[in-house]
Amino acid sequence: MLMLKDRFGRIIKNIRISVTQRCNFRCFYCHREGEEYISYYEMLPEEMERIVKVAASLGINEVKLTGGEPLLRDDIIEIVSRISRIPGINDVSMTTNGFFLEDYADDLKRAGLMRVNVSLDTLDAEKFRMITGVDGHESVVRGIIKAVKANLRPVKVNMVILKGINEDEVDDMIKFAGDNGLILQVIEFEGPRIDATYEKYHVDIADIEDRIEKRSIKTIIRSMQHRRKYILGNNTEVEFVRPMHNSEFCLHCNRIRLTSDGKLKPCLFKNNNLIDILGLIRKGADDNHLKELFIEAINRRRPYFFNGNL
């Protein structure tokens, strides 16, 4: 089997697929998976399946489904089912805002989804409404609990730290995670571009991480992006995601992205090096041609942050 390796020696094992740009939330900080354009085109389930089959033949074995909000797709169960059955794919997961998760968790598990990440930045309903534009805090919490019961484990809660809004809630979120058998991911506010929103709400989470590290009984450094995970005394796991101006994060990135309209995207932070794989599928390209497109996309990868922007 071929192994995809870029010019910097990074082996690509993960494809992150945005299945839609649509979302029922309006989170003011959302980076939209780096898609800085509006597209009304979406891939069909069989088109995603074919792309993932090609990816699997090149050694990619992990698939993350994202959006937008993936549960807005009426055919999301079919998408999960098709992808989970592909030989060589051994991990299929999803990032969701959790609003519809209570209704979908059991069907997603039966279709082959293994685990979920759920976005939840606050335990305060009013703050939640301010961040998302939706009165949906209780629905998301119920979705998280249902995901645990459906055995979509580990269930990870993604908490983006926003200056002046939720820095003081980390300890409460750790308790929530511990009480419900969750992993907490503390995430630095990231953005493909530095704008007024970023300047207003971005905060360096190093101080928070230092505090949690001192409380931990064990530290694990993950191979993916060299993320640090801390095990606390009650066995609660807290992982830190610090992408901005972080050369270690970039140098150990093992993923490629597929946009909702079928373009291979080598880097979250760049939009000038996309490859339109869906367009060629719809023109009748064979699998060998699609493999060449993957290889070309991998060759376009370079660490965005490496002692500054390369």
Residue ranges of predicted features:
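Short, conserved beta-strand edge motifs with alternating hydrophobic and charged residues
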Residues: 158-160, 185-189, 222, 240-241
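Residue-level signature of catalytic and energy-coupling elements of molecular machines
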Residues: 19, 184, 262
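Accessory C-terminal segments flanking Radical SAM cores
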Residues: 192-306
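Flexible, acidic/Gly-rich N-terminal and inter-domain linker regions that tether
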Residues: 1-16, 22-26, 205-219, 305-306
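Radical SAM/AdoMet-radical enzyme domain recognition
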Residues: 45-65, 69-185
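A short acidic, helix-capping loop that chelates divalent metal ions and anchors anionic groups
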Residues: 34-38, 124-131, 193-198, 276
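Canonical Radical SAM [4Fe-4S] cluster-binding loop centered on the CxxxCxxC motif
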Residues: 7-46, 267
